[in-house]
Amino acid sequence: MAPKISISLNPPYNGEFYSSNDQMSGIVSLQLTKALSIRKISVILKGFSETLTKIDQEYMFQQNGMMMPGQDNKSFHTLMKFEQRVFPPDNVWNALDGSSKPFKVKPGSYNYSFQFEKFPRKPECLKNHTAKTVAFVTRNNARLPPTFNSHWQEFNKIDNLDLYFYSFGKVIYMVQVQIELGKSSSWFKPFHKLIREIETFEFIPEPKDLIVEPDEDDNEELNAFSNNSRGNSLVTNNEFFNSSNLKVPSKDVKVVNGVGYIKSDRNFSQANSILIENGDIRSRPVSSVTSTRQSTRLVNGMKVFPSTYKMGLPDGESNMRIEVRSRDLKQIYRKDYLFRSGSQNFDKVYVVMEGNIASLSKMQITPLKLQLNLLETTTYLSQGIANGNYSSLKLIEIDLNQLKSNKPLLDLNEIRENFDGSMFECELRLKDHPILRKLVFNEEDYRHRGNRLYSFKTCTIKRIFSLQLLIEWGINGIRKQSEVNIDPVQIFCQVREHVEAEALPRYVPPPTYTEMAS
């Protein structure tokens, strides 16, 4: 009967997943029912990333003018690998002086403890990167990535093409026990036999090592070559799925410190927008999204995120747009308030109007519905070929008029003009809505396709998020919709650390003394 091996890992410090400050440790249990010749037992801590990208026949035909079979491109990167021998002990191993003679281990149960150093900050594969290695990161901003798609085998069992392609990129960490048996006495089995057992675990670095560096040349218009294999979009379970396959042009690859990396992968990682039309969520054509790229500006120290388009008003001359103003909307942690006053997220939303103030003051403008979506763009890269996967998570959908309040969310009596009188603005007080002001981000620690919600970028995998705020308006009985995109937003699955001031010690009055009579 074969030996029985089990691996028991000590729990992480936070009780949920291993992080940068953890030291992987545990116990290896070995049960033998009969004597076994063992040369050594090793514990290996390792991590790797793997991507598979595809080019379909239609794209190959456009490039070569002939039908050719679809091409698969694979990439494999070793992120870390550490080995520790637990049997025999160091003093015995050193005394062997290179001898390969095995030990005869009697039947019974044996336990071996192990402990590794803290996780490294940078991946090991960087030493193998060259100028011909096309990657999403440089040597300077490369960090050890989090676990991603560790349950990829389950995707292959589901009859869903989107999940199937989503599983083509993965980051896996594991502890592996390797038992090297003694050499067989038979001449036809001249090699040492290996017995292996693995235990995967979830690793997510500290937030400072998850931050996705902004792409260079962000304002430069890049022309990626599409193979026109963008599939039909569909909506299931409040999720929007899409995918695309593109070839990274050589002009978009820059060499830094001897490593080629993509200056900006904006074109093949731009998610489709979601529209509400007659009560249904529908996808907007790609052309209308890319042609309305937003630009942010600063007002009173706050970033301004304008709506993607202006809405014409009934008088035919005026228009309005929505602006989200925030100091810290580019990073969102789990359990952060989204609309609450002081959250610095969606607590300052303004309606900005252009036109005649007399005409504007007569209009009936009312917010009717609100929907907030989290858009995910996951891009896999292999040998210069990039495949994009897109999805959308609905964070909230609410009828703004369902709960009546004494004060309306938008009061045009509070409208004010700017310094030159060309524009007018009025605050949309979403922070006063009784439901929205209690809404926190990802309170339940949701797993999307088996993964927690976090942004990251590594050599061949990039996962970024953006937020999409949709508001349906009633303007003099006509329904219109505004859309604001915050792209990208750094998402963390950790809870934000709040630094609390140390409380002052309680005042204790000094003791009183009385003079004793002599």
From Swiss-Prot:
GO terms for biological process: endocytosis. CDD domains: ART10-like (cd22952). Ubiquitinated by RSP5. GO terms for cellular component: cytoplasm. The keyword Transport does not apply. It comes from the Eukaryota. Keywords: Cytoplasm, Endocytosis, Isopeptide bond, Ubl conjugation. It is found in: Cytoplasm. InterPro entries: Arrestin-like_C. Its main location: cytoplasm. There is a cross-link at K118 (Glycyl lysine isopeptide (Lys-Gly) (interchain with G-Cter in ubiquitin)). The keyword Chaperone does not apply. Belongs to the ART10 family. Interacts with RSP5. May regulate endocytosis by recruiting RSP5 ubiquitin ligase activity to specific plasma membrane proteins in response to extracellular stimuli. This is Arrestin-related trafficking adapter 10. It comes from Saccharomyces cerevisiae (strain Lalvin EC1118 / Prise de mousse).
